[in-house]
Amino acid sequence: MSLLRTITRATKTIDAIDSSIQADQGAAYRQWLGRVIPHMDDAYRGADGGHRSHMGASLIGGECARAIWYGFRWSHRASFPGRVLRLFNRGHLEEARFIAMLLSIGVQVWQQDAQGKQFRISHAEGHFGGSGDGVALGIPDLPAGTHALLEFKTHGSKSFKGLVDEGMRASKFEHYVQMNVYMRKMGLAAGLYLAVNKDNDELYGEIVQLDVETADRFLDRGEKLVFMQEAPKRISESPGFWKCRFCNHRPVCHLKEEPDLNCRTCKHARPGAAAQWGCALHNCVLDKDVQARGCPQYHRNPEF
């Protein structure tokens, strides 16, 4: 069966959003937006706290396992130009717009769990995980009473066209994996993927049913990468390979530059239980600040 035949477009949801906004010329949508934006902490936080402590579920579907491993091991902290940082920020702000659209058509949306915290999943002793965009009830394209994961993404025109033509699984497999990992860990059977074309504000919606095989395969991949002391193979041995040329880890991976000096690039560091890291040399637990500094006995992991 082709992937195209398995795509379930969320046409009822998209049509309801467009009709609702047109009916009152966006009044209800804007009112909801005003209530939602203050809760989008990621859009206006200050310092980002440095390297991410965990391996993210949003990355685990990526083609290159070595790049994922390098990121988890803090090999190189990328510095982005202002345009790219504004692009990241736009993605956070768009979440508020998506939520306001759903609220304006009567969908119930939860951005936080019962403890008032962002929906998060955890795996591999807490070293692998991520946070979902929300949970919804009352999505027009799903049976009544179905709670569904929410995932929101922004796309440029070329990427958006691929999404419309091929569906999310074929055109953005990392997103498909991310959603299934979240649904599997959260006990949800379905999800709603909403995307916007940043160039013309066209919307795309897709219903995703839990794919247990894919979810378990990539949860297993995440666990293996977390505890792997040796770097996985490169996707290409050529530094000129087009995917490698655009990778943040190319300087360390292909050009033999030194990785950043920190505990995670040291041969003595080991991920352990309860999301902790330990030092085999000093026989101690390493908190995040200590990991970032390293120590005088630092010895670069030869895998870098």
Over which residues does each language-model region extend?
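Short, histidine-centered active-site or binding-site loop motifs used for metal coordination
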Residues: 154-156, 197
